[in-house]
Amino acid sequence: KLFAAGEFSDTVSVIRDGKVIESLPAPVQPGGIAAVGDRYLALIAVSERVLLVYDARSNEVLGVTDAGTGPTHIETLGDEAYVADTEGDVIRRFRIGSKPVETAKVAAPGTPYGIAVDSRRKRVWVTLTATNRLIGYSVAGPEMKKFATYPTIRQPNSVTVDPGNGDVFIASRTEGQLERISPGGDGE
């Protein structure tokens, strides 16, 4: 089954075989949503500024925690979720289980927005829309360590990673462009 957050309907749709089979209640303006293995589903509620954890099998809400001053996007790696707290200029890491727990945060001045995970290399990539930058964090150890910064196209809203070679792709709605960065060294 698949899950989709309805940002303007305040629901999470459960989809099987291309059909909505259930609508789960969600907080006001659910934004980013991400699977955590096959057991949990993590959801960012933009307006309520919380992270919810659903049981992906029973569809029940298991836990809720504060997600900062303005969370917008979420990605997962293993049993951890990484959240772009756009208004707080912070990247937050949560351990996801029946009770989500914030385990780390790092400053990301410049309005962090887009976020992507490179699971093979244990990296998190974040776009900074106010400064037109891409920041790379190593998450291989207990801390999130910034290892690279790259200039980007204007208004870098979306980011994704090629899992094969680690190239990072950034999209700009403002510019209507797609930029590719092949990480090497430490960036700038």
Give the residues covered by each predicted segment:
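Predominantly soluble domains enriched in secretory-pathway, periplasmic, or organellar proteins
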Residues: 1-188
